[in-house]
Regions:
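Bacterial N-terminal signal peptides that target proteins for export
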Residues: 1-9
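Sec/Tat signal peptide C-region and signal peptidase I cleavage site
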Residues: 17-23
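Extracytoplasmic "Venus flytrap"
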Residues: 29-50, 70-77, 99-101, 163-171, ...
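Beta-alpha junction/loop-to-helix N-cap segments that form part of ligand/metal-binding clefts
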Residues: 41-45, 55-129, 138, 194-200, ...
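Extracellular/periplasmic Venus flytrap/periplasmic-binding protein
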Residues: 81, 124-126, 133-235, 273-283
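Periplasmic-binding protein-like
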Residues: 86-98, 118-120, 161-164, 211-222, ...
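Extracellular/periplasmic periplasmic-binding protein-like sensory domains
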Residues: 232-304, 318, 373-378, 382-387
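Segments of small-molecule ligand-sensing domains
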Residues: 290-300, 311-371
Length: 387
């Protein structure tokens, strides 16, 4: 005869076991730059991913995700090793990466392991031309190009000097913007540089003496921006604005380089500090602030969106029984929802055709959205320079 106490214990154990079946934990690999040249952007993305996991695990109930993070040190070979190590640890998918030259080989490695690779850090057009069925990204070069071109149209730019890194995504963007500007009758000077260069005074001096443009556009990365703006601050070319793209109009850059950032313009979906209107946005901002004791910026928002879409697809695939049969990619392709970066859906190549960006300007320690005018949170300072 089983005592009442033992019966209660057995029932509780059975219920716990049943709950365990339903509340399965899925391990997701995070391959991201936490050190090296891309560390500022990588850290912002990583914080957004962690925030997504916190919110998902708190609100989903039925399923949980566990993050395993490996620092790729901003190095393509180490990114490949990170993906291979994560695959050996049984992750169900990979999220992360920053820089197309890193994401390319890393996502190739994920494809060989039949793992979904989700990113917001690689916009090179060739990434979605490889025929990979497991590659997904929420942003792309056309979204950045449109933002830059809209800004130039709005301020009436007549001439531009484009300083661009010879890396894939930066070259793509520079040449596409050149083509579009020349079609509008804008005079364009092109200045390519090797990613190893740290002294930008020769190229800035050439622009100052020969091009004499309205605007300098930088298609580059964090450390490049710093070098170019520093050289321009010394040589003081007679331009009206210094404009860049990703990872420039961020709170982190303002904090780290307060003397270089005033009036500099870069892509930014969010003003800083930001005030969200939607319940999802408010929960994201509140959770992020509790975790990291600071205000969100757009890099963290990108990290959050890509991770949350992945986690939601994992949960759906687990529910319909397709996750363990390689069905996660198909489930991700069913995504179509409004997110903190706008509507996201994925085409056959894993690209988000709805992606569009805005331009933000550093003003008095804040980032103000200045373009497109219809979505501006404040007026643009133009002409406006850091010197």
């Amino acid at each position: 005869v089983i005592s009442k106490f033992k019966r209660t214990v057995l029932i509780a154990a059975a219920m716990a076991a049943a709950a365990q079946v339903h509340a399965e934990e899925f391990t997701v690999g995070v391959q991201i730059a936490l050190t090296g040249a891309m560390a500022r952007s990588g850290t912002g993305f990583s914080e957004g991913i962690q925030t997504a996991a916190e919110i998902f695990n708190r609100s989903n109930g039925k399923h949980k995700v566990k993050l395993v993070t490996i620092d790729d040190e901003s190095n393509p070979a180490k990114a490949v090793s990170a993906v291979e190590k994560l695959a050996s640890q049984g992750v169900v998918a990979i999220v992360g990466g920053f820089g197309s030259n890193i994401i390319g080989p890393a996502s190739d490695a994920a494809a060989k392991q039949n793992l979904v690779y989700m990113t917001a850090g690689g916009v090179d057009n060739d990434l979605t031309r490889r025929g990979l069925k497991n590659f997904f990204r929420i942003n792309n070069t056309p979204g950045y190009e449109k933002a830059v071109l809209t800004l130039f149209d709005e301020v009436g730019v007549k001439s531009v000097s484009i300083v661009y890194s010879t890396k894939e995504a930066t070259t793509d963007l520079a040449k596409n913007v050149q083509k579009a500007l020349e079609a509008r009758g804008v005079k364009v000077g092109m200045h390519a540089f090797d990613p190893a260069i740290t002294d930008f005074k020769p190229v800035v001096n050439k622009i100052k003496l020969q091009d004499k443009p309205d605007v300098i556009l930088m298609s580059a990365y964090e450390n490049d921006y710093v070098g170019i703006i520093r050289a321009a601050k010394v040589l003081k070319p007679e331009v009206k604005a210094m404009v860049g793209v990703w990872s420039l109009a961020t709170a982190k850059m303002a904090k780290d380089f307060p003397d270089l950032m005033p009036n500099v313009i870069g892509t930014s979906l969010l003003p800083f500090p930001v005030e969200y209107k939607t319940p999802e946005g408010k929960e994201f901002a509140d959770t992020y602030k509790k975790l990291f004791n600071k205000e969100v910026d757009y890099l963290a928002q990108f990290g959050y969106v890509k991770a949350m879409l992945l986690f939601e697809a994992i949960a759906r695939a687990a529910d319909n029984g397709s996750l363990k049969k390689g069905g996660l990619a198909d489930e991700l392709r069913k995504t179509d929802r409004q997110t903190l970066i706008g509507r996201v859906m994925f085409d056959a190549n894993g690209d988000n055709p709805n992606f569009r960006h805005r331009m933000g300007q550093h003003q008095n320690g804040k980032v103000v959205i200045v373009s497109p005018k219809s979505e501006a949170t404040g007026p643009i300072v133009y002409p406006g320079l850091p010197w």
